[in-house]
Amino acid sequence: MTNFYKVFLAVFILVCCNISHAVVSFIGSTENDVGPSQGSYSSTHAMDNLPFVYNTGYNIGYQNANVWRIGGGFCVGLDGKVDLPVVGSLDGQSIYGLTEEVGLLIWMGDTNYSRGTAMSGNSWENVFSGWCVGNYLSTQGLSVHVRPVILKRNSSAQYSVQKTSIGSIRMRPYNGSSAGSVQTTVNFSLNPFTLNDTVTSCRLLTPSAVNVSLAAISAGQLPSSGDEVVAGTTSLKLQCDAGVTVWATLTDATTPSNRSDILTLTGASTATGVGLRIYKNTDSTPLKFGPDSPVKGNENQWQLSTGTETSPSVRLYVKYVNTGEGINPGTVNGISTFTFSYQ
């Protein structure tokens, strides 16, 4: 009976008594690992759908509700900082580099992953605005979670990433609260992981070099500047994996910096005052030339197919155009390259 009374009294005192002054202590770990040890993640995406974010279906992260014990009106927020180099951005959020091929999106915040702040840059930033505990004991936690990002065009491959330091979160006392000598900063490292990256693309069924014979015309068929006459036509055909949307860019092989819609004639041409324009299908607007690159969003890139087409094709029409410089008859030769982007 006496022993029971002592236990009951101890519990009663712990519950009933208020904390009359601000207190804080560190009860976490200064070094923390993010994600499972030796994680392995797999995904499939179109070859040029980059940067490609791995959505693993769960959070690759670290969370701990008990990093600091606080009480007695102590006010605390959190700041976060990423130490990895910024190699790009996606929807306003920094992409941080791990290797040449693999990057990270990073979120930091309090214990709840869903309230994490999307990190940008390499400066300290507010990741949890904070709160003031009442006259009782409680805890302050934190969380970090990441998503891998494929950065570069490649064939299907496996990428291994070694353990890497990410950055830090620090406790930020405010409203007169002070941490004193208490540990305020904790560090994070990403555990090693492997990405099994499968890419989808297309195969060109048309020969890689296509010669279009241009019809002979008279100068009288192009009487005014801007007048056009059909010179020739050809088609491009591909066989694609399911879900691939094909985009294409025409590049002027003679003048690669050309961004107009008139193809430069080669040095072998003897005619002057005439140029070539290229149209696709039934479009009334000619295609413009752009850089020789498969990068998503390349200048003057145009959509050739949708993701529902596995055997896409495009009909191309080449037209003579009067450039307004006075036509002198002769031969006309032009070279354009096509670069496909599988998105």
Swiss-Prot record:
GO terms for MF: carbohydrate binding
Entry binding sites for a carbohydrate: A65, N66, D110, T111, S138, T139, Q140, G141
S-S bridge residues: C75-C132
One GO term (biological process): cell adhesion involved in single-species biofilm formation
Keyword set includes Transmembrane: no
Chain residue ranges for the region called Receptor-binding lectin domain: 23-199
Pfam families from the UniProt entry: Fim-adh_lectin, Fimbrial
Bias-annotated ranges (Polar residues): 298-307
Signal peptide: 1-22
Record's subcellular location: Fimbrium
Major place of residence: other
Disordered: annotated span: 287-307
Annotated family: Belongs to the fimbrial protein family.
Record function comment: Essential fimbrial adhesion factor that mediates binding to N-acetylglucosamine-containing receptors in the host intestinal microvilli, leading to colonization of the intestinal tissue, and diarrhea or septicemia. Also confers adhesiveness to laminin and basement membranes.
Protein name listed in UniProt: F17b-G fimbrial adhesin
Organism: Escherichia coli
Lineage: Bacteria, Pseudomonadati, Pseudomonadota, Gammaproteobacteria, Enterobacterales
Gene (name only): f17bG
